[in-house]
């Protein structure tokens, strides 16, 4: 049906007859000469039809060409010629194809939007097949394809085995809500779609496969946002007989190689490492964006003698924090803008945002200065490193809450003051706490997941005694403020796994019911093992330069968890419900 791709026609083909197929990108009738931009997945080439040529066939061709609409599907035969008016904006801009035959393969209906427009997201998702024709969307999908291909090549080359794990599996508490599938042959029972292949890949290590990977589809019934979908894709990996450093060194090399191969991006030869505690102290986040040269500074010791109640209450609380953030040249902020910053941090839990301005003259303006002696306040600002022209923001309260809203403020200030450098800053975050205490549930929860091994603790009694301060063997890879991969060394001894379940409030009977197959497998000579999973959607979005992972997923869901193209989810018939033994209950709004 075609001999060449549109976007690959070049000077080497001048004088040759070619057959092309594609879509009408633009058709222009310029007084007897028709120019058609014919587009396929490789690009655009200009097709020319001149009605003035003394040829009956050309007259018919011109009639066809002048009646074309956007996105009509064509087959064109013609001769490649040098183009008189070179177009340097496209790679075929030095040539054109003088048409000898044009066949309309399919007419397109009037379009809801054109391929070169950028309409609202809802209409793009409704007509996703048209949206995906746009050159920018084609570029982003190709980025994703190249990324997956490069990852597979690297892993295949290093002896990893691509092994599929079940999609219909057992419901287990891994954090988010499961998607459940009724089991028709077992009335009242349900499968769950996997949130990750975590347990299966561990069992593959017990089974002796040594190095596993999978481009895995995962499902989590959770609230959506720009970087989260109900169904997503991850590169899942597991290694037997490895330490944390073994895993990190291998995947570091892989990510460096893949970024260079896919996008020409050069990453650091060695990724820096930072403990979770240091990341929270300096940046208020366990996924810090190192491109922003702003850090939080703890000032509890310097504000303890003030009479400002929010500060003194935080200092007195064992879980309190008082942190400062200096923004260079920040005195340009008006009172209205400062109030907007306060409102912004309130979304992240702040109950107030104190500040101090240092005018270029050296004058200090601050609503909290009156709660300090003049020397004490000057000493505080000096400790923070504040200079003339700077503004300093202060956050006080619960440690985690202060970290959250001051981290959000740091990111916003970085954008607003153009402090984000145009480079790539990867790092490893390590030494996560093994557990977090859930005040509401009055029990421990796993910071990573229940299968992560504790660090430097082999004795069960010691783990029980030091659960609140125990560290895990977990690690995250962070790039420009995005967690792109997370992993850990796993628990491989059944008695340690039981002890962790116990600390998490999972009873022996519940552990047996939900994880009995894992506990049994660990009894039969499970090797030490560990692994990591990378978010394909997120990495593809970073490389492609988009803030939304929806742009690199061919058919994403909206933030309302719908597919606008297919109208999923949709009701099903009573007959279908009866077959799967399900009765639905309507809820009143």
UniProtKB/Swiss-Prot annotation:
Catalyses which reaction(s): tRNA(Asp) + L-aspartate + ATP = L-aspartyl-tRNA(Asp) + AMP + diphosphate
GO CC terms, sorted: cytoplasm
Residues noted as binding L-aspartate in the record, renumbered to the chain: 174, 220, 448, 490
Location of region: Aspartate: 198-201
EC number annotated for this UniProt entry: 6.1.1.12
Subcellular location: Cytoplasm
Keywords carried by this UniProt record: Aminoacyl-tRNA synthetase, ATP-binding, Cytoplasm, Ligase, Nucleotide-binding, Protein biosynthesis
Origin superkingdom: Bacteria
Keyword Cytoplasm: yes
Classification via Pfam families: GAD (PF02938), tRNA-synt_2 (PF00152), tRNA_anti-codon (PF01336)
GO BP, sorted A to Z: aspartyl-tRNA aminoacylation
Residues given in the record as ATP binding sites: 220-222, 229, 483, 535-538
Cystines in this chain: none
Family: Belongs to the class-II aminoacyl-tRNA synthetase family. Type 1 subfamily.
Function: Catalyzes the attachment of L-aspartate to tRNA(Asp) in a two-step reaction: L-aspartate is first activated by ATP to form Asp-AMP and then transferred to the acceptor end of tRNA(Asp).
Quaternary structure, from the entry: Homodimer.
UniProt name for this protein: Aspartate--tRNA ligase
Organism annotation: Xylella fastidiosa (strain M12)
Lineage, top ranks: Bacteria, Pseudomonadati, Pseudomonadota, Gammaproteobacteria, Lysobacterales
Gene name, Swiss-Prot/TrEMBL: aspS
